[in-house]
Amino acid sequence: MRIQEMDMREMGMSGKEQERTGKPSEAFYRVEKQLTIQLIPQKGNERLLAEVPHIRWLDLAMVFRIYREEEGCSLSLLIGREQLSDWNVTVEEVARKAMEHMPRLLPVKLCGVTEELERTAKGMGLTPPKSPEPEDGLKLYLLTNQRGYNGAAAILYEGVLEKFAEEVGKDLILLPSSVHEVLLLPDGGDSDYEALSALVQAVNETQVRREEWLSDHVYRYLKEEDRIIAAGNGTEGNGVKGGVWG
């Protein structure tokens, strides 16, 4: 499905349909179930972040979009400061509504990378590649949403990382593939986070379009603490509660 991205700051769209009160406007209630979060890197997006409502989260930032599907085409509208003013809401209120409705609007997709490659190959009429199981028994998993669009934000979905970590019985390493997806690797306890971060950097530079970069290092999910921390490149230590913006 084709997805058309638009910027509400450039469209002159506003919700000024009633006088301001202490409550959100009717326009906000009409769009609240279409609110979504896009995770982007803070670095390199300073100009954008100076102009749009956002919440900083580790070294990333949450920006907000309205996602609609109409007549075989998906529309993704970036929300500007004017919309929050017109809607009479705070950025935290937008974030809470997005967290509430996004898992239903864009359901999570979590599967093995090998299985996903096999499905893709079969769908294209190709012979699925044969991938040997890793010697350490640790599989690589793909986390995104059912549309594969801005799916890295699925790491924010309540309980997703917690439940998966419980299933595999290990902490998780999060490899930021792009703004659209994150790769998950069960942490065997002897992982080289610096080497994995170097791998992420190499993939970014050779395989990912610049505007779709998410991060140049890996993250860790600590299941006993339900917490995500940055790892690699000297970033070890700062963290936020899993599924909660900070």
Question: Where are the language model's segments positioned?
Answer:
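An N-terminal, globular interaction/scaffold subdomain
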Residues: 1-35
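Alpha-helical oligomerization segments
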Residues: 178-246
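N-terminal accessory interaction module
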Residues: 1, 34, 39-51
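A contiguous, surface-oriented mixed alpha/beta subdomain in the mid-to-C-terminal portion of proteins
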Residues: 46-207
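Generic recognition of long tandem-repeat/solenoid scaffolds
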Residues: 1, 141-143, 230
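Feature targets compositionally biased, intrinsically disordered low-complexity regions
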Residues: 11-14, 122, 136, 150, ...
